[in-house]
From Swiss-Prot:
Its cofactor is heme b. Belongs to the cytochrome b family. The chain crosses the membrane at residues 33-53, 77-98, 113-133, 178-198, 226-246, 288-308, 320-340, 347-367. Binds 2 heme b groups non-covalently. The keyword Mitochondrion applies. PANTHER family: CYTOCHROME B (PTHR19271:SF16). This is Cytochrome b. The gene is MT-CYB. Heme b b566 binds at residues 97, 196. One of its GO terms (biological process) is mitochondrial electron transport, ubiquinol to cytochrome c. It comes from Ctenomys lewisi. GO terms for cellular component: mitochondrial inner membrane; respiratory chain complex III. Heme 1 (or BL or b562) is low-potential and absorbs at about 562 nm, and heme 2 (or BH or b566) is high-potential and absorbs at about 566 nm. One of its GO terms (molecular function) is ubiquinol-cytochrome-c reductase activity. It is a multi-pass membrane protein.
Length: 379
């Protein structure tokens, strides 16, 4: 009799993906973030579902319904803060995951990499729309400012913005459709994750050396299932510490003031995980130029497979490229800091320099350093 795990049409898919999957024997903890992102997505869908049971997508009652969830619903405060801080964890792991992909040359799996970038856009869109739902001051003004950027698109811009708003300003129609999209997108993301994994399992995982590991593979279970569970344990400790001790640490105090179209907050800014892109947007004193720079700051990831000129896949044995990688990370920290600062001297010039360095490092410095390393190694 054949093993059900290997013969059942449904179970064998799970078996080939998570149990008998041949995995490189040397993958480090940097490979844990994929599974952590999966857990985060599941957690967000679950907590989001319970929040949606009590939330009302109406401008007059949205803010009150969130207050009601926190005060009157059993463990509503816990669900709400797990959802809000879960989004922060999601983005931390997402950036680690992308950083690992850049460092170890995982972007050479073109299909997996490109669907990953589309996933990033989908997650960013979901998070942005979710931030609008509590209908606080920063929700309202953030929605107004960011959607207004589309008016920079030539010819169709202004019409497009009014079409998205469902009127002449951010109002009831906007909130309702944002809730609808915020609810449906995570399920679309789940489907995209499956495609992401499908492409990954066609090639097999990369490893820290960047070399072919076909000669040294081990089954995913139990070796990496136990490793992933440990990662999830660390993640839950981090998330629950944040939720229980400082739930509002990463939020904005302005969002505890109900939305008021007649009163603009002194500094309109998005959640911390968008600040680097927001800083790049603000560093160009032209509306269309800023929007193009904003989109380019993410789309530039698609160029990594093209600008990879090194004969080695991974950065493990390329010290000069490693220095540039960490320069890029430091640069992103500077951009994140600048994105949260007011538009005044010296922050303007720092933001412009950091934005320029970001693009220059990826487009010029990294490829030219790779060529130099090839020469040094007589390749």
């Amino acid at each position: 009799m054949t093993n059900t795990r290997k013969s059942h049409p449904l179970i064998k898919i799970v078996n080939h993906s998570f149990i008998d999957l041949p995995t490189p024997s040397n993958i480090s903890a940097w490979w844990n973030f994929g599974s952590l992102l999966g857990v985060c997505l599941g957690l967000q869908i679950l907590t989001g579902l319970f929040l949606a049971m009590h939330y009302t997508a109406d401008t007059t009652t949205a803010f009150s319904s969130v207050t009601h969830i926190c005060r009157d619903v059993n463990y509503g405060w816990l669900i709400r803060y797990m959802h809000a801080n879960g989004a922060s964890m999601f983005f931390i792991f997402l950036y680690f995951h992308i950083g690992r992909g850049i460092y170890y040359g995982s972007y050479t799996f073109m299909d997996t990499w490109n669907i990953g970038i589309l996933l990033l856009f989908a997650v960013m869109a979901t998070a942005f729309m979710g931030y609008v739902l509590p209908w606080g001051q920063m929700s309202f003004w953030g929605a107004t400012v960011i959607t207004n950027l589309l008016s920079a698109i030539p010819y169709i811009g202004p019409t497009l913005v009014e079409w998205i708003w469902g009127g002449f300003s951010v109002d009831k129609a906007t909130l309702t459709r944002f809730f609808a999209f915020h609810f449906i997108l995570p399920f679309i993301i789940t489907a995209m994750v499956m495609i992401h994994l499908l492409f990954l399992h066609e090639t097999g995982s990369n490893n820290p050396s960047g070399m072919n590991s076909d000669s040294d593979k081990i089954p995913f279970h139990p070796y990496y299932t136990i490793k992933d569970i440990l990662g999830v344990l660390f993640m839950m400790i981090m998330l629950m510490s944040l939720v229980m001790f400082t739930p509002d640490l990463l939020g904005d105090p302005d969002n505890y003031t109900p939305a008021n179209p007649l009163n603009t907050p002194p500094h309109i800014k998005p959640e911390w995980y968008f600040l680097f892109a927001y800083a790049i947007l603000r560093s160009i004193p032209n509306k269309l130029g800023g929007v193009l720079a904003l989109v380019s700051s993410i789309l530039i990831l698609m160029l990594f497979p093209i600008t990879h000129l090194s004969k080695q896949r991974s950065m493990s044995f390329r010290p000069f490229s490693q220095c540039l990688m960490w320069l890029l990370v430091a640069n992103l920290f500077i951009l994140t800091w600048i994105g949260g600062q007011p538009v005044e001297h010296p922050f303007i010039i720092i933001g412009q320099l950091a934005s320029m360095t970001y693009l220059f490092t990826i487009l010029i410095l990294m490829p030219s350093t790779a060529l130099m390393e090839n020469k040094l190694l007589k390749w």
